[in-house]
Swiss-Prot record:
GO biological process, one term: coenzyme A biosynthetic process
GO molecular function annotation: ATP binding; dephospho-CoA kinase activity
Function: Catalyzes the phosphorylation of the 3'-hydroxyl group of dephosphocoenzyme A to form coenzyme A.
A Pfam family recorded for this sequence: CoaE
Listed HAMAP family: Dephospho_CoA_kinase
Gene Ontology annotations for the cellular component aspect, listed alphabetically: cytoplasm
Record protein name field: Dephospho-CoA kinase
UniProt pathway annotation: Cofactor biosynthesis; coenzyme A biosynthesis; CoA from (R)-pantothenate: step 5/5
Organism whose genome encodes this protein: Geobacter sulfurreducens (strain ATCC 51573 / DSM 12127 / PCA)
Domain DPCK positions: 3-197
Subcellular location: Cytoplasm
Coiled-coil intervals, chain numbering: none
Keywords: ATP-binding, Coenzyme A biosynthesis, Cytoplasm, Kinase, Nucleotide-binding, Transferase
Length: 197
């Protein structure tokens, strides 16, 4: 099984790229979805997060309020590191389980989509790193529109992540997503045809 590690900055278009790859025949494992599973009430990660950040980050049903937690971790790098020390091992374990299931089922191409693939040291579990690249201004505009954030809040979130240029330098494949959706789809189809003829 070929495993593509799909990464990119916030609002770079990773989900759009993953949908195109699914259409081409890949099976996608989304680290964000695994993160939601890993911190569900009753899990050890959930208990550790509440112990680290307090009950003020909980919704009435006991689930983690991602927006409240996000406002803490994007404002404080030590808080972000504390959260990542809790969540990354739990996400890694879930990803390994999913990848093992896919290997057993004979899936030819899997995509592990993770915004922090490189930062979390997860590149060793993939065969190739594909980076979805957009320029910073496009990223800021997309984050503001998608998440309803102010420019300064969007800039703060971008500052908390590895710069796009550094991420792109670590990828075996860089997918430019500054153009139209049609251009993006065409680029991915060309890359796919070369990689998986």
């Amino acid at each position: 099984m070929n495993i593509i590690g799909l990464t990119g900055g916030i609002a770079s278009g990773k989900s759009t790229v993953s949908r195109i790859l699914e259409r081409l025949g890949a099976v996608v494992i989304d680290a964000d979805q695994l993160a939601r599973e890993a911190v569900m009430p009753g899990t050890s990660a959930h208990r550790s997060i509440v112990a680290a950040f307090g009950e003020g980050i909980l919704l009435p049903d006991g689930a983690i309020d991602r927006k409240a937690l996000g406002s803490i971790i994007f404002a404080d790098s030590s808080a972000r590191k504390r959260l990542e020390a809790i969540t990354h091992p739990a996400i890694r374990d879930l990803a390994e389980l999913r990848l093992a299931e896919l290997r057993r089922s004979g899936v030819p191409v899997a995509v592990y989509m993770a915004a922090l693939l490189i930062e979390a040291g997860a590149t060793d579990r993939v065969d190739e790193v594909w980076v979805v690249y957009v320029d910073r201004e496009t990223q800021v505009r997309r984050v503001m529109a998608r998440d309803g954030l102010s420019r300064s809040e969007a800039e703060q979130r971008l500052a908390a992540q590895m710069p796009m240029e550094e991420k792109a330098a670590r990828g075996q494949v860089v997918i430019d997503n500054n153009g139209t959706p049609e251009e993006l789809e065409r680029r991915i189809e060309e890359i796919w045809a070369k990689r998986f003829p």
